[in-house]
């Protein structure tokens, strides 16, 4: 009887794996949170190309650990913000989109991610000119309305990926016809 009580948990461990989040076979996650804090970026509105965007991720990796192995697209994504919006003329953030186009960033990862948390804010604050928010941010097609308030702030958007993936497509959009999505991103955490 004592042997069977010991063997049941051991067999469950061997059959199921030690931890679903460990990123091993069947786990689908990295097992570790990889955080990128863009507060150390120093430019104000310089367009990223794939190389400079990748460098920004490497330099922004908290504790030096990076799961990002490359950037395959950086379209209308900026190191810092030039004029306009809630954080105009500000370094230490990544701006997505512009008045005439959405922003898009495609990351390749060393292993599959299953959760992404983006600390961000809408391009505008709530004012008479902009009484409602229509800017969205998506990760791998999962679109969420951006945090929006009367004063500039920050909020987390959490994306639990439908399928673990080693590619992340982050892009803005707008629900109003003939408008384009814009936002400010302060940090990204990939798990």
Question: PLM ranges: what are they?
Answer:
Residues 3-8, 14-40:
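Bacterial Sec-dependent N-terminal signal peptides
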Residues 5-6, 11, 72, 175:
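Intrinsically disordered, low-complexity repeat segments enriched in small/polar residues
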Residues 36, 40-54, 58-65, 78, ...:
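Terminal, low-complexity interaction segments
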Residues 64-73:
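Predominantly extracellular/luminal regions of secreted and cell-surface proteins
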């Amino acid at each position: 009887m004592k042997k069977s009580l010991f063997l049941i948990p051991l067999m469950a461990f061997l059959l199921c794996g030690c931890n679903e989040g460990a990123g091993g076979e069947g786990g689908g996650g990295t097992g570790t949170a990889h955080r990128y804090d863009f507060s150390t970026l120093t430019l104000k509105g310089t367009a990223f190309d794939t190389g400079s965007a990748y460098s920004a991720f490497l330099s922004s990796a908290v504790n030096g650990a990076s799961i990002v192995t490359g950037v395959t697209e950086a379209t209308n994504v900026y190191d810092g913000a030039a004029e306009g919006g809630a954080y105009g003329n500000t370094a230490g953030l990544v701006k997505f989109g512009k008045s005439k186009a959405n922003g898009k960033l495609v990351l390749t990862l060393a292993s599959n991610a299953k959760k992404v948390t983006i600390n961000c804010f809408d391009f505008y604050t709530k004012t008479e000119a902009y009484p409602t928010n229509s800017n969205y941010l998506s990760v791998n097609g999962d679109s969420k309305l951006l945090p929006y308030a009367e004063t500039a702030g920050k909020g987390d958007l959490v994306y639990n990926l439908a399928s673990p993936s080693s590619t992340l497509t982050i892009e803005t959009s707008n629900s109003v016809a003939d408008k384009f999505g814009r936002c400010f991103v302060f940090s990204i955490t990939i798990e």
